[in-house]
Amino acid sequence: MPRGFLVKRTKRSGSSYRARPVEPLFPPPGPLAAQSSPEEPGRGLLGSPCLAPPQDDAEWGAGGGDGPGPSPARPAGPELRRAFLERCLRSPVSAESFPSATAFCSAAPAAVTSGEELVPPQVPVSVPIPVPGPAPHGLQRRGKGAPVCASAPAAVRKPKAVRRLSFADEVTTSPVLGLKIKEEEPGAPARALGGVRTPLGEFICQLCKHQYADPFALAQHRCSRIVRVEYRCPECDKVFSCPANLASHRRWHKPRPTPACAASKPPHAPLTPPDPSLATGKENGRVPRTDDQHPQAPDSSGDGQHRDSAARPGLQALVYPEAARPQAPYPEVILGRHGPGSSGASAGATSEVFVCPYCHKKFRRQAYLRKHLGTHETGSARAPTPGFGSERTAPLTFACPLCGAHFPSADIREKHRLWHAVREELLLPALVGAPSEAGPGGASDGSAQQIFSCKYCPSTFFSSPGLTRHINKCHPSESRQVLLLQMPLRPGC
């Protein structure tokens, strides 16, 4: 809040209420005033004490006599008049209303010395205009000299108020990422001055200076000076709005060579050279990703690669038998490992292929093939396809010495032999004195008890409904023929 905002505006001066010694306004007429004039010529102007020595009746005599006056009512004495004037001058109201009482007091004796009678004032005398001079300290603070002092800061602030902001767009970078502002053409219309206001209803683009009738049209306006900056990847044609994003993206295109991949890549180069415009071996390239992007770990069983080279033609053609090999739980022939370039289909591949000997599925890793072989072990005993031949299938699997069924592992074969032992114990009383069984799926021609054997597995049942339930549950119709092809006819026990 500014200083003096709530101060009551009056004409009162800022002088204090302290009474100052002043000269008496009306010195006594007569010889006393005449005597004081020659003795003290400058006392009336400089000011003197207002209280004079008491002189009662000598002042009012016509000829200066001591007798009483002719009037029956004695006029007021000079002391009473002086006390009245002093009381009026000492009051706060008169001190504030008449700040120039000193000048009035100094001018009054000069008028009285001419010999006029003293008359008490009936009407308040108008305040004379004070002569400009050194004002009191209080008046200097609150006087009208304050605007003079404030004019110096106003002169300093004047250039700031006069300064006009220039809105000419010299910036060529947009705050929106990926946008750039073109430089203004020399022939473009200049913008109106800051003092000139555009009429209402006109909306002007600040860049191209086009005017529109409503703000919606201005918002939909596509300025010709705003250009979209695109940073395109030279290898995959992806577009980015920031060069840093493009640099981060291009790191994915860097090749990832490994010593093993570099050693095996020259002999297995592709037959047709790739297009030089397309990126090869890139993760985001348009060509299909090859296996070199994530090279396989070197196989620890690579020492037997040349040893299997003679077996590959037999496995691919499925016609020629293979030489016998020592039996093992998972021999290398079962894994069906094929090196690169073993056939026309795998000529372009740079990784090894592992073929399952039962279903001829191909796998890239040996671990995948081992996991797949576990699915063949879960079912009943199954032999390879007849195309392999009995000579070829014997060393590949574990054959049952009783019925000739082949199994991929010794554990499954032992379970199968347990079925033979249980069946012999059950059928021994019924087969005593009876001829041999008619066939694998028939019933024995013996006496009371009849035996039903499954055609697809070595399971045996004593009733036809039990065999039917077993066939419907364990050998569904879609896989019966496949199982029949894989399962050779076994001789009767």
Swiss-Prot record:
Its main location: cytoplasm. Residues 1-20 are annotated as: SNAG domain. GO terms for cellular component: cytoplasm; nucleus. GO terms for molecular function: DNA binding; DNA-binding transcription factor activity; transcription corepressor activity; zinc ion binding. It holds the Pfam family zf-C2H2. Keywords: Cytoplasm, DNA-binding, Metal-binding, Nucleus, Repeat, Transcription, Transcription regulation, Zinc, Zinc-finger. Expressed in spleen, stomach, liver, kidney and testis. In the pancreas, expressed in islet cells, including insulin-producing beta-cells, but not in acinar cells (at protein level). In the brain, expressed in the neuronal cells of the cerebral cortex, the Purkinje cells of the cerebellum and the hippocampal region including CA1 and CA3 (at protein level). A zinc finger (C2H2-type) spans 203-223, 231-253, 354-376, 398-420, 452-475. GO terms for biological process: cell differentiation; negative regulation of DNA-templated transcription. Residues 1-77, 248-310 are annotated as: Disordered. Residues 1-12 have a biased composition (Basic residues). InterPro entries: INSM1/2, Znf_C2H2_sf, Znf_C2H2_type. Residues 267-276 have a biased composition (Pro residues). Residues 283-294 have a biased composition (Basic and acidic residues). It is found in: Cytoplasm; Nucleus. Induction: Up-regulated by NEUROG3 and NEUROD1. May function as a growth suppressor or tumor suppressor in liver cells and in certain neurons. This is Insulinoma-associated protein 2. It comes from Mus musculus.
